Amino acid sequence: MKKVTVYITLKPGVLDPQGKAIQESLQSLGYQEVEDARVGKFIELQVEEGPNIEERITEMCDRLLANPVIENYQFDLEGVK
Amino acid sequence: MKFAVIVFPGSNCDRDMYHAVKEVAGAEAELVWYTETDKLEGVDGILLPGGFSYGDYLRSGSMASTSDVMHKIREHAAKGKPVLGVCNGFQILTESGLLPGALMRNKHLSFMCHQEELVVEDNQTFFTSLYEKKEVVRFPIAHGEGSYFCDEATLKELQANNQIVFTYKNNPNGSIENIAGIRNKQGNVLGMMPHPERAVEELLGSDDGLKLFKSMIANWRDSYAINA
C-alpha cells in the first residue's frame, strides 16, 4: 500500500474569496502581519502498489480531483507499513 | 419538441424546469432520473436543472460530470442537439468540458438569492432569438458558487465568437466581464447561473424567462420543418 497525499491549490491570480475572508479575520484578531491567505484542499488516498502508479494518480487529479481551469496540484507518495 | 429534465441526487430545480417547459411553454417534457440513460433516445432537448447534484462534493457539478448520463449528453451535444444548463446545470457543463471556464465561490462568499437584471448580449442564438439585442430582463439568481472565471485566452475566444449570451447589469458575484451565461462555439449548448425557469409567470415576479424556452421551441420547429 502507498499513501498518496494530494495538495490542490488555486492557481496564482485566481481570486480566492475564502482566503481573503480568512486574511481579514486574522487581521481583525490583531495579526496585522498577515498579507495574504490562500485556501486549498488536501486529499489522502490509500492506493495499492502497481505499475504506472504516478501516471495513474496524475490522471486521477486531472480527471476528477482538481479542476485544471482554476487549480494546480501536486502529490507525495509514501509507503505504508 | 421533447425535452428531458435530468434529475441527479440533489437536484432541486428539476420540477420548476419541468413546469416551465411543459405547463407554461407547452412542450413535451419528461423528468429523467440520472440512471435512466435509455430514456434519452428520441429526446430533442436536454435540460440540466439547478440544485446540488451529489451534494456538490469536491466541487459543484464535478461528481455529476463523471456520471454515465453525462456521456450520453456529450453524444447528444456532439450531434448538434440543444442542451441548456441552469445554475448547477451550468456548473456541470463547465466541469464536463462542454463549456469553457469554471464557476467559483461568489466574491463576497455569501449565498445569494434574489432577482437580478441581465442584458441579452446576443439574440442571434437558438436560445434567445425572441429577445431584442441588449434587452434587459429580470431573472432570479440563487447560488453560492456562481462567479464565472476563465483565463485571458479563453475570454478572448468567447468574445471573438460571440459566445457571451447574458451579462449581469450589476455583477453580484464577481464574474469576469459580468458574465452570466455563455454558449459553446457551435451554439447548441447554453449554460447560465440565473434561473429562467423561475421567471415564466408574472406570479413569480417576472415572466422574462418564458421567451428563452419559447425561442428553443420555435427554433427547433423551424429547423425540423427545414429538415423534414
UniProtKB/Swiss-Prot annotation, chain B:
Its main location: cytoplasm. Residues 3-226 form the Glutamine amidotransferase type-1 domain. It catalyses: N(2)-formyl-N(1)-(5-phospho-beta-D-ribosyl)glycinamide + L-glutamine + ATP + H2O = 2-formamido-N(1)-(5-O-phospho-beta-D-ribosyl)acetamidine + L-glutamate + ADP + phosphate + H(+); L-glutamine + H2O = L-glutamate + NH4(+). Its EC number is 6.3.5.3, 3.5.1.2. It is found in: Cytoplasm. CDD domains: GATase1_FGAR_AT. GO terms for biological process: 'de novo' IMP biosynthetic process. One of its GO terms (cellular component) is cytoplasm. Pfam families: GATase_5. It comes from the Bacteria. Keywords: ATP-binding, Cytoplasm, Glutamine amidotransferase, Hydrolase, Ligase, Nucleotide-binding, Purine biosynthesis. Coiled coil: none annotated. One of its GO terms (molecular function) is ATP binding. Part of the FGAM synthase complex composed of 1 PurL, 1 PurQ and 2 PurS subunits. Part of the phosphoribosylformylglycinamidine synthase complex involved in the purines biosynthetic pathway. Catalyzes the ATP-dependent conversion of formylglycinamide ribonucleotide (FGAR) and glutamine to yield formylglycinamidine ribonucleotide (FGAM) and glutamate. The FGAM synthase complex is composed of three subunits. PurQ produces an ammonia molecule by converting glutamine to glutamate. PurL transfers the ammonia molecule to FGAR to form FGAM in an ATP-dependent manner. This is Phosphoribosylformylglycinamidine synthase subunit PurQ.
